[in-house]
Amino acid sequence: MKTIAFFVPQYHQIPLNDKYWGEGFTEWVNVRNAKPLFEGHVQPKIPLDNNYYNLLDKKTKIWQKNLAKKYGIYGFCYYHYWFNGKMLLEKPCEQILEDPEIDLPFCFCWANEAWSMEWTGKKTVIMPQFYGNKKEWKEHWDYLVRFFKDDRYICVDGKPLLVIYRPESIECLSEMLAYWRELAEEEGFPGIVFMNQSAEFMLDDRKDHSQIDFEIEYEPINSRKSLGKNKFAHLKQLRRDVLSFCEKKFGWDFRRHGNYLMMKATNMQRPSYDEAWEDILTRKPHGNNSIPCAFVDWDNSPRYHERGQVYIGATPEKFRKYFSEQIKRTKEVYHKDMMFIFAWNEWGEGGYLEPDELNKYGYLEAVREALIENGEFPW
């Protein structure tokens, strides 16, 4: 089974982050500065042996590759940041492209949202997200295709796989993806596979899904929406529509503004880990093209502080049990051979398989044991 873990590349210094958050800023700054918000809340999370790594260091990428293979992760889905010709955090993947020693399959998720200071509570938009026209789409394609042609890039039936974080914010979605399909065939591929990661897009039948091949049931976001779907439904939809208009018109991403009040109103600021997994393991696939997902844990208080959301009750033992059941469902209910995992290294949002001081290699061992138990270890 192809177990693909989402991977955040913000573990190295870049000039834009230095300018807005201070010299030397990386995701580790938020992780180190995290504070417990209530009794029993474990923060800060500390990497095992204080391994606050630099992702530009080759030894780090080799270590991550070896760890993933040892414990059964098939590949990484790296977040890719492209703003109408400008890029952020691109260097680690460019280094991987040039280094065959890092022999782990990978793919991209285009994190197509504005680069902003929203996690600080400010509405400052540093780099808005616009999409341009065919000229800009071709420029983006020309960058991506170098990776698509790499033997390590994850394909489905020979077609390179590209995940899109938020298709609903792309006004020219159908035209752009249709154009990229043409370019893929011109390059000699049998096509290209587009996957959606957004729960809002997946659950909104008013959107044009015609160019999306598969929908990832991204967790725990889908379970969160499922468990809270009947509370303030009309108000939530109105808010989504207004914010979607602002994003398409001005390139702003203000979705998270007001999230704190909404979570408080719907009692979802401290959700139960077990209830979330119960929903995941009993929910029917949204459609025949749904791809299942697992989540390790969720705690984004390192970024959002008191406005954050903290799931209660996660342990490696529970995760092993739930993950094993999700492997079975992937085969028997979804009829797929691929599952995404939140996440390899989302330390700022509490979703990481990498070892820490509290659980050591517990979550990685849970993955390995569950895969072996189900006869699905990929290596």
Where are these regions (language model features)?
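Aromatic-lined glycan-binding groove of carbohydrate-active enzymes
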Residues: T3-F7, P15, C172-G313
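Conserved, mostly hydrophobic/aromatic
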Residues: A5, A68, G158, P292, ...
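Active-site groove signature of glycoside hydrolases
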Residues: C77, N112-A114, T120-T124, W141-I170, ...
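Acidic-and-aromatic substrate-binding clefts and catalytic sites of carbohydrate-active enzymes
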Residues: Y11-Q13, Y52-K59, Y79-K91, I170-C172, ...
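Substrate-binding cleft of secreted/luminal carbohydrate-active enzymes
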Residues: A314-P355, F377
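N-terminal regions that are enriched for targeting/export leaders
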Residues: M1-W63, K69
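Aromatic-rich peripheral "rim/lid" segments of glycoside hydrolase catalytic domains that contact
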Residues: T26, P36, I96, F342-N345, ...
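Aromatic-lined substrate-binding rim segments of carbohydrate-active enzymes
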Residues: K59-F108, S290-P292
